[in-house]
Amino acid sequence: MTCQTYNLFVLSVIMIYYGHTASSLNLVQLQDDIDKLKADFNSSHSDVADGGPIFIEKLKNWTGSNEKKIILSQIVSMYLEMFENTDQSKPHIKHISEELCTLRDSLSDGVKKVKDLMDLAKLQMTDLRIQRKAANELFIVLQKLVDPPSLKRKRNQPQRRCNC
């Protein structure tokens, strides 16, 4: 119950956050549907506050717009997974699920980035073959870390002309 209630709260935040960019979202209807969903899950139960929020704390660590899309894409996917195990015959659940699917589709780039991060986490850096590949790519990775704006500033500076 605790997870589900905080999930519902974060769902509200996601819907509102993307409601400003996705004009097709009817936030008033979604809020009403989410209230019905909270009632379905009995989110006023006393154990809801135990352990703190599930997603809200994670959202605080992702500050940039692109970063938020990455974490929100994962959270939206988790909500959709949660709704797979609920009664889809209820209109409010069906409506929320449909809106989440629309949001997930608009965040598909974030889903790919999450997959990339998970793939990186799975790499066995003790494997000699992986180490060889990593050594081969190290210079390119370091080039990506170099501050590109410093190079741009040099190009944009007016060239000094010789007054000979």
Curated annotation (Swiss-Prot):
Is-annotated flag, keyword Thylakoid?
Answer: no
Localized where? Secreted
Annotated GO biological processes are:
adaptive immune response; defense response to virus; humoral immune response
- What's this protein's name? Interferon gamma
Signal peptide as annotated in the record: 1-19
A GO cellular-component term linked to this record: extracellular space
Q: Does the keyword Signal apply?
A: yes
Q: Keyword set for this entry?
A: Antiviral defense, Cytokine, Glycoprotein, Growth regulation, Secreted, Signal
Q: Name the gene behind this protein.
A: IFNG
| A GO MF label | cytokine activity
- Source organism phylogeny: Eukaryota, Metazoa, Chordata, Craniata, Vertebrata
At the top level of its lineage, which domain of life is listed?
Eukaryota
Q: Which PANTHER family match?
A: INTERFERON GAMMA (PTHR11419:SF0)
Attached carbohydrates are found at N42, N61
Family that this chain belongs to: Belongs to the type II (or gamma) interferon family.
The record's function comment reads: Produced by lymphocytes activated by specific antigens or mitogens. IFN-gamma, in addition to having antiviral activity, has important immunoregulatory functions. It is a potent activator of macrophages, it has antiproliferative effects on transformed cells and it can potentiate the antiviral and antitumor effects of the type I interferons.
Q: How does it assemble?
A: Homodimer.
